[in-house]
């Protein structure tokens, strides 16, 4: 759906079960207007630590200087890598202000009011181009990693979960995924037609997705499963699922 007008600011969400999320925004500074805090229905408060591209570039330069000045430290940071202070203002996905989520902290839990975590619940690192590089859990262990095409900003060519083999992706000239390769699992091929996508796995099973709409409102309205059954879906004007009919 299209973004709300500038004078309308999202302050909270309530789901069908009455559970709430209240959003708190920074009033000033480099991330003014961005959500930097969340309070859930149980009264727990979370701090969202945000960084700008300039802040990440400065941190990179400091890390590189430390690495180069210490003979004992591993050369994990390339001395030739460029980390710009700014990102291109516009991308094929829309405007990019360079602000990224760096960490999520639990700052208050009514069930344990006297306990404060000493580490974030999750932490995120990014490439010099602002792409998500890795996700770390509260123990500091990397749980996800991503690799991108050096010639196409934002195009993910591989990702992996901790302890699992890396999945890789191939694209056509228009930037659509044509193949997903999983070393210890099924591989998938993707073929694109008019308002449809055909997915075939390495066991030659096929599914077909039929779509309607354009841009951000494009939705799958029918799915033909490998066993011949069909699932149909209906959406409202905002693109939200309102009904689904399965083979039964």
Predicted segments with their positions:
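Extended charged/polar low-complexity repeat regions
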Residues: 1-248
């Amino acid at each position: 759906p299209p973004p709300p007008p500038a004078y309308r600011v999202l302050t909270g969400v309530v789901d069908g079960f009455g559970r709430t999320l209240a959003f708190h925004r920074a009033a000033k500074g480099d991330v003014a207007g961005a959500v930097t805090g969340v309070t859930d229905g149980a009264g727990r408060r979370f701090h969202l630590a945000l960084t700008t591209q300039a802040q990440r570039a400065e941190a990179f330069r400091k890390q590189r200087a430390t690495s180069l000045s210490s003979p004992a430290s591993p050369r994990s940071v390339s001395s030739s890598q460029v980390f710009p202070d700014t990102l291109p203002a516009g991308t094929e996905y829309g405007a990019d202000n360079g602000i990224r989520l760096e960490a999520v902290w639990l700052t208050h839990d009514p069930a344990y009011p006297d306990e404060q975590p000493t580490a974030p619940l999750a932490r995120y690192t990014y490439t010099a181009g602002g792409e998500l590089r890795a996700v770390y859990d509260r123990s500091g262990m990397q749980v996800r990693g991503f690799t991108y095409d050096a010639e196409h900003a934002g195009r993910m060519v591989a990702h992996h979960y901790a302890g699992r083999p890396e999945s890789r992706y191939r694209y056509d000239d228009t930037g659509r995924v044509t193949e997903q390769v999983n070393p210890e699992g099924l591989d998938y091929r993707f073929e694109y037609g008019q308002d449809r996508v055909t997915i075939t796995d390495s066991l030659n099973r096929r599914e077909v997705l039929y779509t309607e709409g354009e841009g951000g409102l494009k939705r799958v309205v029918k799915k033909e499963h490998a066993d011949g059954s069909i699932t149909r879906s209906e959406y409202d004007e905002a693109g939200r699922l309102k009904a689904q009919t399965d083979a039964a």
